[in-house]
Amino acid sequence: MSYNTFGHIFRVTTWGESHGPALGATVDGCPPGVAIEAEAIQHWLDRRKPGQNRFTTQRQEPDAVRILSGTFEGRSTGTPIQLMIENTDQRSKDYGEIARSFRPGHADIAYHWKYGLRDYRGGGRSSARETAARVAAGGVARAALAALVPGLRIEGYMVQIGPHAIDRARFDADEIERNPFWCPDSDTAALWADYLDGLRKAHDSVGAIVEVRASGVPAGLGAPIYGKLDSDLAAAMMTINAVKGVEIGEGMAAACLTGSANADEIRMGPEGPEFLTNHAGGILGGISTGQDVVVRFAVKPTSSILTPRRSVTTDGCEVEVVTKGRHDPCVGIRAVPVGEAMMACVLLDHLLLDRGQTGGLRGTIG
């Protein structure tokens, strides 16, 4: 199996399976001298780990990260950083009944067609368990960004679960860390809680939309045509399990706007040009403008549910499949820190690319 690595200069290779002994990431291209401690990476992993509330899978994994290489006396050496997370709460017996059946909505049948075999225990490599390694790598990227661009901030939050979207007029950033949904609207968070409780009782699941915003991003990251910042961000978000669509800025809604409404006007401010709006999501022509970079991605409903569904076996027999085990009623909840991690990795990669190409040179206005 190839294609386990992403990035250009800051490169991340993830490895491991859901029910294997461990999983992790090899991070290459981190600049030397960056302060990197396991405790700091653990902070980001703790935001993603399962079993923290009734709205996520009850699999109990501490997700304790170990740094095996690439640091000395708490700082990066410039050599590959190896991160490892042990799996401690696998229940492979939960999947014995589907060893020869394909779960509808899962990668099972596609893996079987491509490779001729598959790890049926929790999806193996296709499990969202793999994203723990991405969050660990994102912790390294955040540390490097903090050293190189001190004012840069990345924050993700849920904006919709099922048909229920937040009220943007009630957006409160302080609310994001106060509820299990990373929701910036307390009223909607309460609605989501009742909604998900009902779905859990009905043995069903639902999709969601996550928004990730990066502020303090320097202007000039990205490149025209094939090196666009937004194309790399979209590709990164699409690699997250269950993601089925990505928007930058106004996204699909831009198709409903007129040119006069969508184009972000510019005026001269005390410190230079200022945009009056941000429909572009902080990126024009594939290059960052200095405004907030705004990305949204849609996550499909969890495919593992207790409702019987029709499928087939490896022998070609028709069967009904009930997916046992411990699963999230809405995988979008734990996708929030994963989206943040992917944003961090892509921004650091483009920052290093830009420094290599332009040396930080910038055009001036005024």
From Swiss-Prot:
Supply the EC number(s).
4.2.3.5
Cofactor detail note: Reduced FMN (FMNH(2)).
Q: Does the keyword Flavoprotein apply?
A: yes
Quote the record's binding site residues for FMN.
125-127, 241-242, 285, 300-304, 326
Q: Where does NADP(+) bind?
A: 48, 54
Which keywords does the record carry? Amino-acid biosynthesis, Aromatic amino acid biosynthesis, FAD, Flavoprotein, FMN, Lyase, NADP
GO biological process terms on file: amino acid biosynthetic process; aromatic amino acid family biosynthetic process; chorismate biosynthetic process
Q: Give me the reactions it catalyses.
A: 5-O-(1-carboxyvinyl)-3-phosphoshikimate = chorismate + phosphate
Question: What are the names of the required cofactors?
Answer: FMNH2
Record's Pfam families? Answer: Chorismate_synt
The pathway noted for it is:
Metabolic intermediate biosynthesis; chorismate biosynthesis; chorismate from D-erythrose 4-phosphate and phosphoenolpyruvate: step 7/7
Q: Does the keyword Lyase apply?
A: yes
Q: Which GO terms describe its molecular function?
A: chorismate synthase activity; FMN binding
Say which family it is in: Belongs to the chorismate synthase family.
Could you give the subunit structure recorded for this chain? Homotetramer.
* Task of the protein: This reaction introduces a second double bond into the aromatic ring system.
Protein name stated in the entry: Chorismate synthase
The organism's taxonomic lineage, starting at the top: Bacteria, Pseudomonadati, Pseudomonadota, Alphaproteobacteria, Rhodobacterales
Name the gene that codes for it.
Answer: aroC
